[in-house]
């Protein structure tokens, strides 16, 4: 088990203020959140104990609108009008991505999310299966929404037929 003690804890329960306490974790699940319990803690052979003095522990954030694999385009062609940016910069790069590229870019994004306290997202991108696999491989929670664009010749022809 893991014990995190001397922590300031925010639980998001409506009737509870931030309090000083500790958290016990076993098998990747929180077993206890509450005031420090030194007497009970002394009876346990801890795998790890973390002194969180001066730190706040709070629930993870959720990002409700992501395009995770687009991390590689961050700061690429900034300060452009949206349609120019999409049509002239983003779409040509995305058209060359393989599912394997998208998988690894999604894992990169997940690592960035986790270091920022984001523990779940809703992701919209070209190949939802790759985000699902990357999320499973990283132990990350995600909801995926398929893309509405298709850069393949078949996809373009199909869109033209529908219009």
Segments from the language model and where they lie:
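Metal-coordinating catalytic core of metallo-dependent amide/deamination hydrolases
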Residues: 132-162
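Active-site beta-loop-alpha junctions enriched in small/polar residues
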Residues: 67-69, 126-127, 147-152
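N-terminal metal-binding scaffold of metallo-dependent hydrolase/deaminase domains
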Residues: 1-43
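Alpha-helical scaffold segments that flank or form the walls of functional sites
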Residues: 74-140
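Divalent metal-coordination and catalytic microenvironments
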Residues: 7, 23, 28, 54, ...
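Hydrophobic faces of well-ordered beta-strands that scaffold small-molecule active sites
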Residues: 62-64, 121-122, 142-146
């Amino acid at each position: 088990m893991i014990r995190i003690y001397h922590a300031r804890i925010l639980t998001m329960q409506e009737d509870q203020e931030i309090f000083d306490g500790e958290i016990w974790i076993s098998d990747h699940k929180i077993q206890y959140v509450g005031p420090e319990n030194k007497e009970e803690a002394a009876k346990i052979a801890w795998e790890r104990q973390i002194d969180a003095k001066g730190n706040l522990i709070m629930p993870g954030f959720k990002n409700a609108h992501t395009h995770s694999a687009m991390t590689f385009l961050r700061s690429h062609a900034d300060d452009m009008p949206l349609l120019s940016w999409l049509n002239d910069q983003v779409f040509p790069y995305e058209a060359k991505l393989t599912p394997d590229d998208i998988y690894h870019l999604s894992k990169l994004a997940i690592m960035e999310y986790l270091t920022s306290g984001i523990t779940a997202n809703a992701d919209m991108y070209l190949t939802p299966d790759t985000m699902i696999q990357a999320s499973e491989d990283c132990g990350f929670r995600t909801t995926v929404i398929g893309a509405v664009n298709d850069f393949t010749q078949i996809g373009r022809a199909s869109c033209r037929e529908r219009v």
